[in-house]
Curated annotation (Swiss-Prot):
The N-terminal domain is essential for RNAP assembly and basal transcription, whereas the C-terminal domain is involved in interaction with transcriptional regulators and with upstream promoter elements. SMART domains: RPOLD. It comes from the Bacteria. Residues 249-330 are annotated as: Alpha C-terminal domain (alpha-CTD). The lineage of its organism: Bacteria, Pseudomonadati, Pseudomonadota, Gammaproteobacteria, Enterobacterales. This is DNA-directed RNA polymerase subunit alpha. HAMAP family: RNApol_bact_RpoA (MF_00059). It catalyses: RNA(n) + a ribonucleoside 5'-triphosphate = RNA(n+1) + diphosphate. Its EC number is 2.7.7.6. One of its GO terms (cellular component) is cytoplasm. It comes from Yersinia enterocolitica serotype O:8 / biotype 1B (strain NCTC 13174 / 8081).
């Protein structure tokens, strides 16, 4: 085997043994020594905790107010029924939340096949038993909420946020969204030509049937690759803060003195002194304005009152006045 001593081996063989529709064994080799556990543990954790899926989150059963009760004519108690519903395997297309209904009467088992749903929902294991009716006159009706999520979310984590709005009789269920039911990996020895210190990673997994095992491995690897992508170039993934540029001058200073609606006499006196903008005016002092021909104390008082109503005054100092936009116009 030719190659640099610092060059890492890349897996060249990926073998997928489909034991059943829900059970598969994936073999990956060759791997550098130690990489079997590195990749195997990472993929195992992602498959168990980060895979998206659908799960039962709430149940309403007619005649049942709380989970610590029983229902006449039903063999199982309510806690056992909720536990059975927790194992319901559902595939939902195009929606994040659906409501399923179940109505059954007469002696016999109540299974997932008895659930009524629309075309966007598929019950993967219709033979899954929910409960048993033990009397000809017994019946059971329930509404089942199925939501899309990720990982495992216990009912206790949702109690505080939903307690105020949750009516009596609506029972919360621990939501196990992950479609992966069992995952285990093993690292075996591998050999390539003269090298005998290599790893072979064998991953064995079972799903609830809502996802193909091969697709589950592919999604987990994609999630891992996306999380590591930021480290490739060590780039900063944070969005840069956009700082708002504050204008150099208050917009009111850039408006013409005509906007002050002064008397004709006062306005004409200011224009005669080349005071065209409010910014020009506020930089003048009272003494300077009184030297303006035909502008007396009455006009000065008027100007001061108008400026004060806008939060301005005479004798202000403005750095870098006039701005380029005004200077160019002049």
């Amino acid at each position: 085997m030719q190659g640099s001593v610092t060059e890492f081996l890349k897996p060249r063989l990926v073998d997928i043994e489909q034991v059943s529709s829900t059970h598969a064994k994936v073999t990956l080799e060759p791997l550098e020594r130690g990489f079997g556990h590195t990749l195997g543990n990472a993929l195992r954790r992602i498959l168990l905790s980060s895979m998206p899926g659908c799960a039962v989150t709430e149940v309403e059963i007619d005649g049942v107010l709380h989970e610590y009760s029983t229902k006449e004519g039903v063999q199982e108690d309510i806690l056992e029924i909720l536990l059975n519903l927790k194992g319901l395997a559902v595939r939902v297309q195009g929606k994040d939340e659906v409501i399923l209904t179940l109505n059954k009467s007469g002696i016999g088992p109540v299974t997932a096949a008895d659930i009524t749903h629309d075309g966007d929902v598929e019950i993967v294991k219709p033979q899954h038993v929910i409960c048993h009716l033990t009397d000809e006159n017994a019946s059971i009706s329930m509404r089942i909420k199925v939501q899309r999520g990720r990982g495992y979310v216990p009912a206790s984590a949702r109690i505080h946020s939903e307690e105020d709005e949750r009516p009596i009789g609506r029972l919360l269920v621990d939501a196990c969204y992950s479609p992966v039911e069992r995952i285990a990996y093993n690292v075996e020895a591998a050999r390539v030509e003269q090298r005998t210190d290599l790893d072979k990673l064998v991953i064995e997994m079972e799903t609830n049937g809502t996802i193909d095992p091969e697709e589950a491995i592919r999604r987990a690897a994609t999630i891992l690759a996306e999380q590591l992508e930021a480290f490739v170039d060590l780039r900063d993934v944070r969005q840069p803060e956009v700082k708002e540029e504050k204008p150099e001058f208050d917009p009111i200073l850039l408006r013409p003195v005509d906007d002050l609606e002064l008397t004709v006499r006062s306005a004409n006196c200011l224009k005669a002194e080349a005071i065209h903008y409010i910014g020009d005016l506020v930089q003048r002092t009272e003494v300077e304005l009184l030297k303006t021909p035909n502008l007396g104390k009455k006009s000065l008082t008027e100007i001061k009152d108008v400026l004060a109503s806008r939060g301005l005054s005479l004798g202000m100092r403005l750095e870098n006045w006039p701005p380029a936009s005004i200077a160019d116009n002049e």
